Amino acid sequence: MRILITNDDGINAPGLAVLERIASALSDDVFVVAPESDQSGVAHSLSLSDPLRLRKISDRRFAVKGTPTDCVIMGVRSILIEQKPDLVLSGVNCGQNLAEDVIYSGTVAGAMEGTILGIPSIALSQCYEAGTGGRSGIAWDCAEVHAPGIIKHLLETGIDPDVVINLNFPACPASEVTGLAVTAQGRRDATTIKIDPRQDGRGLPYYWIAFARDTRQPGVGTDLEAVAQKRIALTPLRIDLTDDPTMTRLAQSLPKTLPKVAG
């Protein structure tokens, strides 16, 4: 089985090294094509105005000056064009990709691009608690220990062609995980996102996008609830964003001819 791995934290990120070990536990045919620098939050962006620069690190490791989406396309349509991957893995992200995070996530986008290209794809993210050492105290062993078995089972069961799997590992050591939950995508309180104004040394303003802690109870059956209970959240996401009930309702309610505005 040929595996292509990527991420959004960059070629030197510790989570990518974790994912290389996860992939190596499943296959000896593993290729890495990852961004040259941190691409967190770039979502599914594609480089159309700048050329892609490819740096070959070794026969199986490459860095691309581009986004996670660029990396997957480069891997599938160029580096591995003679024999495309059987699986795309994206991650392991340093931090959660839960709820509406999936809209912004380069990690999830890397897996989505794999799915669009017709390859079973999985995004992996390792949660951490900001108040307990933050990134420096992240429990990478949680993903490293549990991911291989979950991925193997998913491949045996089969992943639908229009679906990308989003895995989030709770902020705890592997030994403290309480189980695996198949979940729905959650929803946070939108008021938690804010602008944090600052001032530089010359007195000029600059700004950070910041997030406050969401104090609401997570929805039942969601990815947010699962990781709060120290369970691994497995969320199937669709590439097709069509809302079928709304499509049906509007098709039935709108007139067959173009409505005219009185004026």
From Swiss-Prot:
Name the positions where a divalent metal cation binds: D8, D9, S40, N93
Cofactor(s) recorded in Swiss-Prot or TrEMBL: a divalent metal cation
For this UniProt record, the keywords arranged alphabetically read as follows:
Cytoplasm, Hydrolase, Metal-binding, Nucleotide-binding
Note accompanying the cofactor annotation: Binds 1 divalent metal cation per subunit.
What are the GO cellular component annotations? cytoplasm
For this protein, the record's HAMAP family field holds: SurE (MF_00060)
User: EC number(s) per UniProt?
Assistant: 3.1.3.5
Does the keyword field hold Cell inner membrane? no
What protein family is recorded?
Belongs to the SurE nucleotidase family.
Q: State the organism of origin.
A: Beijerinckia indica subsp. indica (strain ATCC 9039 / DSM 1715 / NCIMB 8712)
PANTHER family recorded: 5'-NUCLEOTIDASE SURE (PTHR30457), 5'_3'-NUCLEOTIDASE SURE (PTHR30457:SF12)
What is known about what this protein does? Nucleotidase that shows phosphatase activity on nucleoside 5'-monophosphates.
Report what the protein is called.
5'-nucleotidase SurE
Q: Please name the top-level EC class of this enzyme.
A: hydrolase
> Do you know which SUPFAM superfamilies this protein is assigned to?
SurE-like
